[in-house]
Amino acid sequence: MAETKIIYHMDEEETPYLVKLPVAPERVTLADFKNVLSNRPVHAYKFFFKSMDQDFGVVKEEIFDDNAKLPCFNGRVVSWLVLAEGAHSDAGSQGTDSHTDLPPPLERTGGIGDSRPPSFHPNVASSRDGMDNETGTESMVSHRRERARRRNRDEAARTNGHPRGDRRRDLGLPPDSASTVLSSELESSSFIDSDEEDNTSRLSSSTEQSTSSRLVRKHKCRRRKQRLRQTDRASSFSSITDSTMSLNIITVTLNMERHHFLGISIVGQSNDRGDGGIYIGSIMKGGAVAADGRIEPGDMLLQVNDVNFENMSNDDAVRVLREIVSQTGPISLTVAKCWDPTPRSYFTIPRADPVRPIDPAAWLSHTAALTGALPRYGTSPCSSAITRTSSSSLTSSVPGAPQLEEAPLTVKSDMSAIVRVMQLPDSGLEIRDRMWLKITIANAVIGADVVDWLYTHVEGFKERREARKYASSMLKHGFLRHTVNKITFSEQCYYVFGDLCSNLASLNLNSGSSGASDQDTLAPLPHPSVPWPLGQGYPYQYPGPPPCFPPAYQDPGFSCGSGSAGSQQSEGSKSSGSTRSSHRTPGREERRATGAGGSGSESDHTVPSGSGSTGWWERPVSQLSRGSSPRSQASAVAPGLPPLHPLTKAYAVVGGPPGGPPVRELAAVPPELTGSRQSFQKAMGNPCEFFVDIM
């Protein structure tokens, strides 16, 4: 009795299923196939079958009519069951990008993202974005699939009556290469498409005719992960040599005897002025171009064999390329290399080699120690150590600053912390300048690489599609940004990282400091008896005055707080909230100043609004002139303290730092700078309250 073997692939399962129908191959229909799958929700699937087209060769054809005859090859039918949610097909050729992302017909070793026009793959966004939706049907199918997977694992499913383990052992294959055995049973034109990350293998088929024609008809070709280019170049030779690597036009001759298909997709550009040339859209794994490795996505195809594409329309170029591929013999491709204005990719450090970050504080302290440079005025020798130890508190004051070495990254970690780790030089994510339609995108990443990185480096993702959903949420929250601001995530697109500095506006130096050891320390102030330098910094500590010098001039009119202006407790009175100064009335101060022989009038003495210890007693500028008598200075000193020695003009000149320019007296400042002079005098009363040196 005649029977038909049907091999069908389900979702993400690495091993296809085999069923036998007691129907002749030329009479089997889709209804017969669905009857065998009665334990599965067939209404939730689309059915694709391996078929032969007269123009394009081997294709995947969608069949939805139950009475339609199934295409048969060598007495067997090859089918793919794709979930209807998120699955779309292009002209009945392939419905690859389903909810579970299977099966990719040919993986590309490199691509240019969405550089192809929208007509090239119209359903790319909708087909990929359907993965973000969870439906009840999907949950039911996932439950059934998991149950079937456990049953297959327990019963050690057989293929054609042979256990998988025995067949692998007989062929000398590793335990995880089950689909490699099946490739010889299906058809000689099949080859294995492996994904090491997901440990899955799927069967795809292609021939010379279908490779070029399928791309001409603008079928979508999925690139799951960017692969390292193969280094096997024994089957090809080229006229280019090491001395001519600077040329941007190369000719590569490919030996088609070893590789059965060319393995490239082409993109044609057109505008109002005509066709703009043929470009390499993507390179497929296992083809002759991928094995050679010198032709890259984005290169312009100039000539194939002896046919020049320069003055040829896109349709004619496609027709010529189809004819040449269908013939036997070597193929010579002349391409213009994609010009990269910043060729970082040729000189980058391998991703596996970590790049150590530089600590600026440690570098500065080390440089200062070697060169013997003295610290700036107002800093202590241990200021660099203070800066180094306080770097953690400064980092913690930035909102959302990650603690990179405290805990591993999980799905519950802050998304901004994960993005910062992704941007590190040794993170393993390939971030570089990329070309898209001859437009340079600086520091861009591919969506598939982002998903793979999240699935590998972030704990908590059970499946890869969960990592993809997380990447989609990163795009929605602004941590990833598309070149043309697309809001839907696609693994084929290029993305740049969003602006992570938006939270710096809320920077607070006091946040994150739990104790005194975490807080930054101010540098030591100059000696209180030394005149404050007038805005000049010197690379040494200012020395204290010799004993022969008189004490520095201190004006009681600018003391804050207590009535004893010259004492050391004025600041303490202010901080303790003393109200002693509130009892001082303007009349008392005026009588005191007038009786001391000052030159001011009663109208010169004003009291600011609000009383209390925090108020400032203003004093007219005229009392600071050189005409002030020694008697006024002596009488202004608080009781119980010795009178100050008069400050002469000569001391004012020599009072500056040694070796520096002479210090100009405040009275010599032009009148139009009165406001600045008064504020400076206030600051000199208690400089610690005005000048804060933040390390």
Curated annotation (Swiss-Prot):
Regions of compositional bias (Low complexity) in chain numbering: 177-192, 201-214, 559-580
GO aspect biological process, one term: convergent extension involved in organogenesis
Effect of K438M: Strongly reduces activity in Wnt signaling. Abolishes location at the cell membrane
PTM notes: Ubiquitinated; undergoes both 'Lys-48'-linked ubiquitination, leading to its subsequent degradation by the ubiquitin-proteasome pathway, and 'Lys-63'-linked ubiquitination. The interaction with INVS is required for ubiquitination. Deubiquitinated by CYLD, which acts on 'Lys-63'-linked ubiquitin chains.
Domain DEP intervals: 425-499
Keywords associated with the record: Cell membrane, Cytoplasm, Cytoplasmic vesicle, Developmental protein, Membrane, Phosphoprotein, Ubl conjugation, Wnt signaling pathway
GO cellular component: axon; clathrin-coated vesicle; cytoplasmic vesicle; cytosol; dendritic spine; glutamatergic synapse; growth cone; lateral plasma membrane
Compositionally biased tracts (Basic residues): 142-151, 215-228
Positions bearing Phosphoserine: S194
Expression tissues: High levels are seen in the brain, testis and kidney, lower levels in the ovary, breast, muscle, liver and small intestine, and very low levels are seen in the spleen and thymus. A moderate level expression is seen in the heart.
Sequence ranges assigned to domain DIX in this UniProt record: 1-85
UniProt xrefs under PROSITE patterns: DEP (PS50186), DIX (PS50841), PDZ (PS50106)
Name of the protein in question: Segment polarity protein dishevelled homolog DVL-1
Source organism of the structure: Mus musculus
